[in-house]
């Protein structure tokens, strides 16, 4: 049973990051070259993901904790997000594209935490098995870049959103095959601090966790410069298959995720 479960979770992770990798790396080039957006507008578009990360998890986390099974919520978010991705190419002005992108990000970002939570809840040996399952997320990102670049040559076209949208709908349907994961806090009172995630701030009292959060905060600053500008830059330099080449950076993720169970066992 665990072998079948790990296979399903690995496929789930692959699809999830294939969606993300299909559009996130090359969107800046599409917005710049095809829609002729200005630099500030492109920066705001990439900020939509951060807005989704700040808004959506609180509401979706509340729904998953108290009202809906995680796999059904993942299915709804995946299918809804897929339809929004199909709609994005129709939005050719910033005033229409940007709000739609924010709404889409509010459907995708919560799937990251929900998927991790579901996986950790069902795996018997989380320290050994979760990093190996998670390895498929990096492989999915790499596969998305290669597919977009080599198969579709789509860095500058709307095809990236169609690829991501199709995969998102498949992801949503596949989520229904995951183990039933009912809400754990049904019938319990809801506090405002819990909805806003303020209870989690208590974790910052642990020095190791506080240092980890600080490091992640600092790392994400240059990371966004990379995602917003890198694909446009190398495209201007005349690189072919730029999204595919950039995706190969995830090879380091694969290596370290494979090594993580060994490190955790020591």
Stretches with model-predicted labels:
Residues 1-3, 178-214:
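Juxtamembrane intracellular "pre-TM" segments in multi-pass secondary transporters
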Residues 2-50, 208-248:
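Helix-loop boundary and gating motifs at the non-cytosolic
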Residues 4-6, 89-101:
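Helix-loop junctions at membrane interfaces in 12-TM secondary transporters
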Residues 50-58, 141-142, 250-258:
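Residue-level signature of mid-helix packing/kink "hotspots" within the transmembrane helices
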Residues 55-69, 152-153, 256-266:
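Helix-to-loop junctions at the C-terminal end of transmembrane segments
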Residues 72-86:
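Structural signature of the two symmetry-related core transmembrane helices
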Residues 102-136:
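Cytoplasmic helix-loop-helix junction between adjacent transmembrane helices
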Residues 160-177:
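Symmetry-related core transmembrane helices of the 12-TM Major Facilitator Superfamily/SLC fold
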């Amino acid at each position: 049973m665990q072998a079948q479960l790990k296979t399903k979770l690995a496929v789930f992770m692959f699809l999830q990051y294939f969606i993300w990798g299909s559009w996130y790396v090359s969107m800046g080039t599409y917005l710049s070259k095809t829609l002729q957006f200005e630099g500030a507008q492109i920066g705001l578009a990439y900020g939509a993901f951060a807005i989704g990360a700040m808004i959506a998890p609180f509401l979706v986390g509340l729904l998953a904790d108290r009202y809906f099974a995680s796999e059904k919520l993942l299915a709804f978010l995946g299918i809804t997000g897929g339809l929004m991705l199909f709609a994005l190419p129709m939005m050719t002005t910033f005033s229409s594209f940007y709000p739609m992108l924010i709404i889409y990000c509010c459907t995708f970002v919560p799937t990251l935490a929900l998927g991790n939570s579901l996986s950790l809840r069902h795996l018997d040996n989380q320290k050994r098995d979760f990093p190996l399952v998670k390895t498929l997320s990096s492989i999915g990102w790499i596969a998305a870049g290669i597919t977009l670049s080599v198969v579709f040559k789509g860095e500058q076209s709307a095809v990236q959103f169609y690829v991501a949208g199709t995969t998102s709908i498949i992801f949503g349907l596949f989520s229904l095959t995951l183990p039933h994961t009912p809400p754990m806090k049904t019938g319990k009172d809801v506090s405002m601090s819990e909805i806003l995630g303020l209870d989690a701030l208590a974790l910052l009292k642990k020095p190791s966790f506080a240092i980890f959060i600080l490091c992640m905060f600092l790392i994400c600053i240059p990371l966004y410069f990379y995602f917003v500008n890198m694909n446009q830059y190398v495209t201007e330099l005349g690189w072919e298959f730029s999204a595919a080449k950039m995706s190969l950076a995830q090879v380091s993720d694969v290596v370290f995720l494979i090594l993580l169970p060994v490190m955790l066992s020591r």
